[in-house]
Amino acid sequence: MPHTLLILNGKESGNPEVREAVKNVRDEGLTLHVRITWEHGDAKRYVEEAATLAVSTVIAGGGDGTINEVATALMSLPADKRPCLGILPLGTANDFATGCNIPLQIENALQLAVKGRAVAIDLAQVNGEHYFINMATGGFGTRITTETPDKLKAALGGVSYFIHGLMRLDALKADSCKIHGPDFHWSGDALVIGIGNGKQAGGGQLLCPDALINDGLMQLRLLTAKELLPAVLSTLFNGEKNKNVIDATVPWLDITAPNDITFNLDGEPLSGRHFHIEILPHAIQCRLPPNCPLLG
């Protein structure tokens, strides 16, 4: 069997369930290398090391940010030398893993990441050098995911983002910008911007419910009203029609703004005044369950 490399977020290095799951894989006679990340850049170094270890699968063990870092590192390799991506969800929200129906039980998830079916999936590229596998969010949602206290996330998981958002409703502020893509043009003040390769963000909120990870497209969703709560937020996440929610499905987008705005790319912040975002079809292989709802 080909070798597998698990890149594990340092916060989970002492997790006894992870240790037991790794032991069980090795007891089957499979080769599973483990590397621990402690700072930004470690994942890229370990992905580069994968080539010398004859690794066919690199597993991202952590949350959405860890998955992003590993997927981004894979894109730095030549296409014919890229290992397959596996996912061991260990974060607060685990939005991409949950959206894919990847088991949240550590033993089951690791077995899938090692042995599961490899499927070609899309990645989104931002300004030619940054990537996201799940979603880019801007506006109020970005500020909430960035500012939610770690202790609240640890105690409540994904619902912590929603609770912290309710606490910060007095700080609502829209971002002025222009957005255009194929047959789509919009300008105005956006309170929430969601650009989805995957469907959900912020701990399970279906921000881009029509998105798929293998269709060569991304879903744009804008919330433009300020007189929203709670009705318009309910509309945004429950799929009801509302004049303040704008949808588009496109292969690329250009976003320009008079002032700096910040997007979270799978939780990783990127600020600027111009963003070119495009889908790279079938960019990487990912081990996914047969019932993955993000596949078309």
Swiss-Prot record:
Active site, UniProt feature: 268
Annotated Gene Ontology cellular component terms: cytoplasm; plasma membrane
GO molecular function, one term: magnesium ion binding
Gene3D superfamilies for this protein: 2.60.200.40, Probable inorganic polyphosphate/atp-NAD kinase, domain 1
GO biological process: phospholipid biosynthetic process
The keyword Nuclease appears for this protein: no
SMART domains xref list: DAGKc
Cofactor(s) required, per the database record: Mg(2+); Ca(2+)
One Pfam family, short name: DAGK_cat
Keywords of the record: ATP-binding, Cytoplasm, Kinase, Lipid biosynthesis, Lipid metabolism, Magnesium, Metal-binding, Nucleotide-binding, Phospholipid biosynthesis, Phospholipid metabolism, Transferase
Top-rank EC class of the record's enzyme: transferase
UniProt cross-references to HAMAP family, sorted A to Z: YegS
Name of this protein: Probable lipid kinase YegS-like
Lineage: Bacteria, Pseudomonadati, Pseudomonadota, Gammaproteobacteria, Enterobacterales
